[in-house]
Amino acid sequence: MGVLSNLEPASVFYYFEEICSIPHTSHHEKALSDYCVQFAKAHGLACRQDEMGNVLIKAPATPGYEKEPGLILQGHLDMVGDKTADCPLDLEKDAIHPVVDGGYVCAEGTTLGGDDGIAVAYALAVLDAKDIPHPALEVVLTVCEEVGLLGASAMDFSDLEGRLLLNIDSEEEGVLTAGCAGGRRVECHLPITRAAVTGTAVKADIAGLVGGHSGTEIHKGRANAIALLGRWLTLLTENGVDYAALALSGGAKENVIPKESSITLVLPAGITEAVRAAGADFTAQMKAEFGTADPGIRLQLTEEGCGEYDALDANSAERLRKALLLMPWGVQAMSMDVPGLVETSLNLGVAEMDEQEAILRFSIRSSVPSAKELLSCKLQTLTELLGGSVRFHGDYPAWTYARESALRDRCVAVYEAQYGAKPQIVAIHAGLECGILSGKIEGLDCISFGPNLLHVHTPNERADIASVARVWEYLKAILAYKV
């Protein structure tokens, strides 16, 4: 018996637990993709799998629905793999361990993968059922969504017949998403020169931050652990502390607000009173600025030994400090048309350093193409002023809100019949594959919805069990709707 075997709807949670048992972080979805292909073959369904691992499964209409317009069910196979500092799992190789915690499903020390495993579970449960009426279905399951919507960008959709698409990649029940931001990934490369230096290696860890999804939670005022390193280095400089930078790390994914970062410095005399004073100033300032959104923020200093180290020379260390201090992050502009909607933002998601260079990795989002280009230009200009270079990749278009949508009207009508209330219709500041599919499939009508998922992209992620059940009933009602 599985951990989730007593939950309803049983078929949905059965497949969700199956998905959890198969590692499927971005770029490592092959096993889950193969599982879906074997599922299709076992059920006698037409299926194709491309070289990337994207999967298309086709199911014929049930009796009485042969003349209804076909529907596309769409979600992504990959998940963001994040974990607590003490979690021993390798999420590229190890299974997720789901647990039931009251009215929620969560995971032990890791992200749950409800984004977007719940969509895959819904789709497989529909295809497996014998008692769910529906028109002809095309199930599209993509890879590498979380790292720039790469699977959808590469997938061939020329054989899709449906023009009505249900994207199940939203995280709030009662909300129908009808538009989203476009995005781009940016890598800023700063060359470094190293030189021998003698002193005490001191590691500074910034931790205790909440983190979160860089699209749907970027407006919540949470601190960025990587950007705070620039503040820390600047306070050291202002307190007259000489240092040489030795190592840098922070964050896990470009689209996750980093909750931890560290920098190792070589200090002439270790943790002196001046260093402690800078640490006290840093903690006080950060708590004053971010205490409401990030009450657990903390700085920990640890001496790691004395000796001679191959650290950054003074010029490289200063350019790194300036980059960490000056690179923009967070909300850049709010929409003038939609109250409360973020228009443009960027997330400094990953920092790393090797022997030759420091690399800062960003995720840019905007519903205005020119604003995305301007922010890209700013990052490029600042990086070049600091002697570095940039690489752009993972570009994807915005999904523009349609004034008229027959599918949206259907979903609203079904929602009102089931819930006795009107759904909220929104555009969001996050990337959805609807933008890519709309650009590739002429005349495509899209809507996105899903159950309540909390704290996605973090080890605190949890899925609301009752909401999963209600949205399952909602999905079945949409499938059974006759035009």
Residue ranges and their predicted role:
Residues R222-L248, Y401-L444:
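Active-site-adjacent substrate-binding region
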Residues E17-S21, T264, R298-D310, N347-A351, ...:
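A short beta-alpha structural unit
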Residues E254-G330, M334:
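A conserved active-site cap/scaffold subdomain adjacent to cofactor or substrate pockets
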Residues G2-Y104:
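Acidic/His- and Gly-rich active-site-bordering loop/insert found
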Residues Y65-V147, A152-R163, T198-A201, A314-A317, ...:
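Active-site metal-coordination/substrate-binding segment of hydrolases
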Residues S158, R222-N239, L267-T272, E318-L325, ...:
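His/Asp/Glu-rich mid-to-C-terminal helical/loop segments that flank catalytic regions of hydrolases
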Residues P9-V12, M336, E343-A358, S363, ...:
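Zn-dependent metallopeptidase/amidohydrolase metal-coordination segment
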Residues P135-A225, L233, T237:
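Fold-level recognition of mixed alpha/beta catalytic cores in primary-metabolism enzymes, strongest
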